[in-house]
């Protein structure tokens, strides 16, 4: 019994010592993790993460996925790069839902009354009359669709023979919306949705790239290729609405322009797979390639203006497209020159550096193109071929 007591007494400090060692190890491990996941400066980065020497600090370097995902809510030099395009993605997701559910929702009465003579010349009035009478079963069979249209639209409102039906302004609008589906045949929306899909893919790919690229060299390589593919997709699909809706009545030029930009987009993605494409020395080459891809859209725009020089919608959409080109071009210039951080290195690490400005300009340019797309839809819904 005495020997056992001695043994136990001898083991007690040893166990206590082992416990203390474990505590020290855990504490040291936590301290190491804390140091390891701190933000570092440019000179401490591995070569594959060195892209812009004018951004001096606040880098994440080779963090595990868990810490990277949590860093979306912390401050570092990629925070605004992630959020500018993540917010842009949700903006275009909302615009896509709006377009699918609300465009077109109500006929523009002002446009209808001014376009009515041209529309009626293109319309099968006998078919229109029968369809309208089917929608108005209580109306006298002696009414003719021409009388109904001209007497109930605003310019003839006070002179009609059927004033009992056209007393209130709301009735006029309801009638216009009743007649419009019989005259207007909405065109296909797939080119517009292709653009919206390309924009969402680009914005989400960019946001994901800026969030995850600091994990490892392999992940960085994959994410950058995804980012370049997104840019090419946005540029290529931006051509689809103007080309399709401008040349929908001329299949040769429509297919020619759409085929050209699609092949060019695929070629750009293939070139971006080259490892040298992501090196800092190729920054100007990357910007020039994407800028040239977008600049090729000048041909169908000029072609559109030659054909539809007398159409207000052609001028309206061209104005939007010029603004879009200026925004994208300015973004490419800022990206390539790394302004303003090259003027004051380290001052724009968190906010205001060139890549963040580039992101904002891309979202603004894409939204401008969305507005142009709405004009194309309204134009072609009314005009057709």
Curated annotation (Swiss-Prot):
Membrane topology, Extracellular segments: 101-191, 250-256, 310-313
Q: Name one GO cellular component term.
A: membrane
Tissues expressed in: Expressed in roots, leaves, stems and flowers.
Q: What is its main location?
A: membrane
Residue ranges annotated as Cytoplasmic topological domain: 1-79, 213-228, 278-288, 335-356
Ranges of Basic and acidic residues composition bias in the record? 1-12
Membrane topology, from the record: Multi-pass membrane protein
Q: Which domain of life does the protein's organism represent? A: Eukaryota
Residue pairs linked by disulfide bridges in the UniProt entry: none
Q: Is the Transmembrane helix keyword given for this protein?
A: yes
Q: Which residues form a coiled coil?
A: none
List the Pfam families hit by this protein, alphabetically: HlyIII (PF03006)
Q: Where are the transmembrane segments?
A: 80-100, 192-212, 229-249, 257-277, 289-309, 314-334, 357-377
Report any one BP term from Gene Ontology.
Answer: response to sucrose
Instruction: Note down the stretches annotated as region Disordered.
Output: 1-22
Tell me where in or outside the cell this protein is found.
Answer: Membrane
Q: Which UniProt keywords are given for this protein, alphabetically ordered?
A: Membrane, Stress response, Transmembrane, Transmembrane helix
Whether Membrane counts among this entry's keywords is yes
Function, please? May play a role in abiotic stress response.
Would you identify the family this protein belongs to, as annotated?
Belongs to the ADIPOR family.
Report what the protein is called. Heptahelical transmembrane protein 4
The species is Arabidopsis thaliana
